[in-house]
C-alpha cells in the first residue's frame, strides 16, 4: 500500500516527494524495516501514532547516506568523548550527541519519564569520557535511535500540551520542527521556523516539517 501511494504522489505532486523520489522511497522502506521496533518501544501506540512518530524523522531517514555517516561518526568517536565536539548528527535518524544528552536529562528530572525510561537511559559510571563514548555507541545503533525517538515524543507531548495540536498533521508539523530545529523552541519560534526552507542539508528548497508531513501522508494506509 505504501509503495502504491508513494508512486501516485510521485506522479502528481510538485512537493518534497516529487523533488526527492529516491529519498522518499528510502524513507518508506526505512519505516517498514523499523516498524516492529517502533511498536516494541511504543506498545500502547496506535498505527496512526506509529506513523506520526516515524514521520518526525522520515526526511532524515530518507536522506541517510551510510558513507557520509561513516565519516561523521568516525569524527565524533574520535573527538567527542574527550572534548564534547564535534557534535555532528549521526546514525539512521541523524541525532546529535547533545540531542541525546538533552533527552537523557529530561528522563532523569521528570518523574514520569524517569519511571518509564530512566533505567535504560542511565549510565553505569560517572566518568564523562566513558559516558560520552557510550552515548556515541548508542547513536550508532538504529534500535537505540528508535528508543531516543520514543523519549523525544513523550518529552514533546508534555512541552506542547497547551499548544492546541489536536490533529495528526499539526503534531507532525510541530514535533518535526522541534526535532529538526531545537527541542526547547517556543511555539512562536516553531511557527517561525516552519517558514524557513533549508532542507535537505545545504539547500533552500523545502521546510523540514513540510517534508515530514508529505511523508506522513505517504505512510497512511
Task: Mark where each language-model region is.
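Classical Sec-dependent N-terminal signal peptides that target proteins to the secretory pathway
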Residues: 1-7
Amino acid at each position: 500500500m505504501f509503495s502504491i501511494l508513494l508512486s501516485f504522489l510521485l506522479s502528481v505532486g510538485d512537493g518534497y516527494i516529487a523533488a526527492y523520489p529516491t529519498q522518499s522511497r528510502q524513507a518508506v522502506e526505512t519505516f517498514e524495516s523499523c516498524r516492529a521496533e517502533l511498536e516494541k518501544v511504543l506498545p500502547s501506540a496506535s498505527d496512526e501514532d506509529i506513523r506520526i512518530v516515524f514521520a518526525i524523522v522520515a526526511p532524515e531517514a530518507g536522506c541517510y547516506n551510510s558513507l557520509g555517516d561513516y565519516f561523521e561518526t568516525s569524527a565524533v568517536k574520535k573527538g567527542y568523548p574527550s572534548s564534547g565536539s564535534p557534535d555532528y548528527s549521526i546514525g539512521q535518524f541523524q541525532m546529535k550527541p547533545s540531542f541525546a544528552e538533552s533527552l537523557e536529562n529530561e528522563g532523569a528530572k521528570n518523574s514520569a519519564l524517569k519511571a518509564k525510561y530512566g533505567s535504560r537511559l542511565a549510565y553505569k559510571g560517572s566518568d564523562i569520557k566513558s559516558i560520552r563514548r557510550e552515548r556515541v555507541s548508542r547513536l550508532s545503533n538504529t534500535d537505540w535511535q528508535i528508543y531516543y525517538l520514543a523519549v523525544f515524543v513523550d518529552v514533546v507531548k508534555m512541552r506542547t500540551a497547551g499548544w492546541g495540536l489536536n490533529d495528526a498533521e499539526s503534531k507532525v508539523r510541530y514535533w518535526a520542527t522541534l526535532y529538526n530545529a531545537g527541542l526547547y523552541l517556543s511555539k512562536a519560534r516553531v511557527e517561525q521556523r516552519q517558514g524557513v526552507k533549508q532542507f535537505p542539508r545545504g539547500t533552500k528548497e523545502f521546510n523540514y516539517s513540510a517534508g515530514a508531513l508529505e511523508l506522513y501522508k505517504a505512510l497512511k494506509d
